[in-house]
Amino acid sequence: MKTIHLSSAGLLAIAAFSLANTSIAATPGTDNADESAYAAGWSSGSNGGIGFKGWNLVLDGQGDAGGFFIGDSKKTGAADINVNSRSFGMFGHDKAKSTDAYRSFDSPLEVGQSFSVEIGVNFRDGNKGFDLRSSDEKAIFNLNVGADDYTVHLAATGAGSIGTDYSNNTVFKLVFTQTSASGGTWTLTRSGGFSKTLNGTYNGVAAGFKFYAAGTADVPENDLSFNNLAITAKK
């Protein structure tokens, strides 16, 4: 019998190949504000649905100027993104602080997987929006609502103003698809009083997200609402 001797470099190459081919995809699943995990409210550690880790809700010293809640997105004149009259909601009125809701997928997206979410907004002062984040907690895509504008930042392609046309019942549906080990595509669909679809690309591997609100006037129309989170299986 012939004995095969492998060098240290060869063993490392095999180990790296094995690791690359046994990576774990994010679990396909959904979450929404009507899940039983939020029956008593929404707080850090809450973990409804499938495919996600628990929420990390950070007030950053805002006190009563910031908060998180489960409520009816229509109550502030915004669009209906509810499931059984329930959506996630948050607010942040302190200009020096930010109200932040962080969450990770149970594993980063693999090539062929997508993540989607619906966001409802009314008033546009201050800053509020959404970050797609990589596993090293870096923002790799941003949608910001502020200064009477809706703007995409940080995207590899497609960044810029979506347009300044105001509608109280604006909904943004965001879909991110991991197309390679180094990036993916995003699609933004606006509905409500105005309709528009934009596309682009992002760099990095999607592993989670952040919603934020800061510096808005103290009126409920400035609440940020979102719902209907979903992770698809590989295609």
What does each model-identified segment do?
Residues G10-S18:
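Bacterial N-terminal signal peptides
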Residues F17-A25:
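Sec/Tat signal peptide C-region and signal peptidase I cleavage site
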Residues M1-G10:
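Bacterial N-terminal signal peptides that target proteins for export
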Residues T27, E35-W42, G67, G71-T151:
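Secretory/extracellular carbohydrate-interaction modules
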